[in-house]
Amino acid sequence: MTLLRSEAPAARRKKVLFAGEIAGWDSWGRIFQDIGLFKPLIQEICRIHSLPFSEPEHLTPGTNAVFAVGEMVFKIYAPAEAGFDQSADCDTEIFAMQRSRKAGVSVPEVIATGILHDRYDFRYLVQSRCPGKAFREIWPMPDHTKTVPAAVSGTVPAAADSVGYSPDPAKTAFARSLRRLLAPLNTPCEIFNNIDVILDPERGKRWDPFPEDFREDRLRIIAGLCETVWKPESFVFVHGDLNEDNILIDGNRISLLDFGDACLAPIEYEYALAATELFRLDKAFLQGFFPEYYDRAAARLLDELADLITRGILIHDFGGDVLRQRFGLCESLHSTEMLRDFIRSRL
């Protein structure tokens, strides 16, 4: 690992700062938001890097221990003892933020990074705190899980109007700006981590709750696309987790947060999550984000957009979770065509 100028060399101390017990992922899940446990580590990081300390505050929980300290954000990664060593995510985030900043995208500034050798080896990253409101604060998304599942049990709604579409220029303008922001990011890039979005079996486990016939069809479709369309040399850099907490809006400025899931992938990987997880297939957003499919009133173009979103969600690490948690889709899906028809009905 190449040391940043702001990175502290690893050093062992006799005094143990962390009083928590980490033995598996469940134990990490119970403690990773505990300010009392992580405060001594944060104080030590501040001492090492001569950073001002103030009382830590909670931020939106994710996978790692993340706290606000004044105008800084401290991220302490789950150690190997948690069962899933997240420290590699730190290298991914640093690379991704540096690349994004060079592309003119507003992202947090890396202030310090390093490893604390305590009771456990804790990789950490200190970033600046970006101003603005999270996307979820401006546009709270509706819960579709109570209204959608019946739509795919047999017949699919005939038109997007049936789910309550109404024009919203502000939504459309924002989505258009986000697409422009992503343009210099979603470009070819050198390999910067070992994530395989297509073949990694661990990334397919979120599809386990789905019916067997759907899972088999999903794998068949992916295999066919790998033979014809998806070649590694055509993959681009993607943020990988464009959700309602990872986008901040401050006037006309859009900031992107949390690049831990950045990777190389087909462009559909990025676009599909934006369409489903971020925009929840809200047509007002989709019109701004995908103008090339909406600017001309052609059903064929919307068919192509439905295909694109379907392909992307089938390979996304969070694809299965998004369909279940945001749209209530799981047991009623028996083919990828049913999923594609559902998506098409919302366009």
Region locations from a protein language model:
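Active-site acidic catalytic loop and adjacent metal/ATP-binding pocket
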Residues: 62-70, 220-271
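ATP-binding pocket architecture of kinase catalytic cores
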Residues: 56-192
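Short beta-strand segments
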Residues: 75-76, 112, 237-240, 256-258, ...
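Juxta-kinase regulatory segment immediately upstream of eukaryotic protein kinase catalytic domains
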Residues: 2-53
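Short, flexible/disordered intra-domain loops and linkers
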Residues: 26-31, 80-89, 321-333
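Active-site activation/catalytic loop segments of kinase-like enzymes and analogous catalytic loops
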Residues: 268-298, 310-342
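Short glycine/proline-enriched coil/turn segments at helix->beta-strand junctions
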Residues: 51-52, 69-72, 103-106, 250-253, ...
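An alpha-helical support segment within catalytic cores of ATP-dependent transferases
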Residues: 33-49, 115-118, 148, 156, ...
